[in-house]
Amino acid sequence: MHLFWGGPDLAVTRFSGRPAPPHPGGIPNLPDWVAREAYSHEVSSCGFWPGGGPISHAAFYSYAYPEPAGFSEAAIQPGGAFYSTDLREFILPYDVVRQSESPDDTLLAFLRTTYEAAADLAHWDRSALERHRDSSGAFLPNR
């Protein structure tokens, strides 16, 4: 978990372990050399944006770099989440989460489905990257 530079968003990033093509840069308030280093490996990233700038309202977001083919068309949950072609990421307005019957489940569905779309479409070795727990909460060995 980290505070993303250039903006006050709180983010979590997962890495595939594979190198990514050089990032083209051009991110506002972020030197190109920093973008190239930050995105030197394939990522699926999600976070919370309090609003302002390109998104006027508070929202959760999720993106992948490099963006795999088909990512923008992936079936993402919950209803209310959408893909922004301007930002090249999925957006879930905070109000959708806040007003849902189960905010935790609503947010988890967004985070889970966007990660799964990124990892599956990019052919990540999920069995080597993910840890699972048994009913007692103990971690199971990787498959």
Model-derived features with residue positions:
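TerminUS-proximal long segments
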Residues: 82-143
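Residues in flexible loops and secondary-structure boundaries
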Residues: 18-20, 54-56, 70, 98-100
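Low-complexity, glycine/alanine/valine/leucine- and proline-rich hydrophobic stretches
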Residues: 41-93
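General "foldedness" signal
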Residues: 22-26, 74-76, 124, 128, ...
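General N-terminal targeting signals
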Residues: 27-29, 63, 77-79, 109, ...
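Aromatic/basic-lined ligand-recognition segments
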Residues: 1-50
